Each structure stands twice: as C-alpha cells, then as structure tokens.
C-alpha cells in the first residue's frame, strides 16, 4: 500500500497546514499518510472507498481522513478536490482543542463524511484561497495566520454540516443523499422522496445533476452497485441474495448493470479477478 509522507507536502518542518488541490483527481489506489487531511469536493463525482467502505461523493462532500485511515478514489468523473492537510489535531503551534471540532468516533463508528451546501462551499473556497495567499513562509505571523484560517474553516464546516437544519434546497438535497446511503435497498418513488425532503421533483433532478452529474436513478444505481461490490468482496452471500439485498429485483438485470459499471461481472469480483490485475 502506498504511504504518503508529510515531508513531501509540508514546505518546511515548522509548517502545520498545507493546501493540495487536485483539479481533477483521477482514480488513485489505496493509500494512507502520516498526516491528517480534510478533503473538500468542489465538483464532479466519484467513489471514495474509506477503510474498505464505499461512499459516493460529489460537490459539497467533505471527508475527514486521519493518519491511520486508508482510502482510495475510483470511478471519478471530473472529480475536483481540495485537500487541506494538517499534521495532527495536537500539532498546531497556536491552536488548542482542535479535536473538539472534528468528527468523533463513538462505539466504533467514525462519521467521516459530511456534506455542505453550495453557499457554504463558496465560503470554504474563500478561506482556502486566503490560506494559499499566506504562502509557505515559516515566520511566526505566517504560521499563525494559516492556523487561524484553518480554525475558521473547521468552525464553518462544523456549523454547516448535516447537524444543522435544512433551510434551503442545497441543504435538503444533501440530507436526501445522506438518507439514500442508508435506504438504498428500498423501493424508491422519486416523487415521494422529493416531497419527503421538501423538494419538487424537477428541483431534485436539476440539483442532483448539477452536483453529481447523474440523474437520480443513475445515482441510486451507483450507490446500490457499490454496496453490492463490497458485499461480493467481504461476504459469502450468493450473487442473487446480494442483488436482492441491495435493491435489485432481478439478478440478471443486476449483473448487466454491474458489468456496465465496473467492466467485471459479479462472479469476477467474487473470485478476486479484478484485484489480480490491479
């Protein structure tokens, strides 16, 4: 597995914050690093496999990666990221208590993926631009300025995360996408789901297309297929059982969609043939 080292990203040993844009981010194999990062998805879509679990990400997704987490990107489509790197929550020179603003692991569950709306994303871009404008100077004022801006970024992300009440269409769409991650196997009526989150069907189609590049049904199919691929790799259930468990009513249709998405059949994945060639 690839290991990324802080010495390659932080311009000097004294630096505590760094910005690494990926415009775009292509598919990247599984890796981990000896630093922490906040991944901000600017636009496009892709699959983020985090500690073995697949997540569909798009514009407004925010991912919190710790130094012991492993992750990879695949099936990227114009996926543009900004990576905000920091050495560790307790490694700042002028900040204390940073960990209180980060996701907290409870009973083995680490809420690594948040979403913010497009208005907040613009504010995030502004703060990131300010951090970049400070440059890589290592004098006291530059280090302090970068850390202050990093704290502003954390506060903004925390206040704007899904814990906040949905007050506009962007926030409602983000909550709908989070809901789909947990209810993907259900039979979905898009009119009912849109109404559940106080969206018109037309608004749902338009905003989801803008944020992910996919129609609602295409997005749902991708989520279902990613969950199915994970089960094929990590369970002993039959292909048919996995198809039904992931919301597909017909195993033949499931196999057709699966091959179209991944260029491998479910049986190929079960036998690990894709891993052999990677």
From Swiss-Prot:
DNA-binding region: 191-212, 239-262
GO biological process, one term: rhamnose metabolic process
Sites marked Interaction with sigma-70: 241, 250
Record-linked SUPFAM superfamilies: Homeodomain-like, Regulatory protein AraC
Subcellular location(s) per record: Cytoplasm
HTH araC/xylS-type domain sequence ranges: 174-272
Quaternary organization: Binds DNA as a dimer.
Major site of localization recorded for this protein: cytoplasm
Species annotation: Klebsiella pneumoniae subsp. pneumoniae (strain ATCC 700721 / MGH 78578)
Top-level taxonomy: Bacteria, Pseudomonadati, Pseudomonadota, Gammaproteobacteria, Enterobacterales
UniProtKB keywords: Activator, Cytoplasm, DNA-binding, Repeat, Rhamnose metabolism, Transcription, Transcription regulation
Protein name: HTH-type transcriptional activator RhaS
Disulfide linkage: none
Keyword Cytoplasm: yes
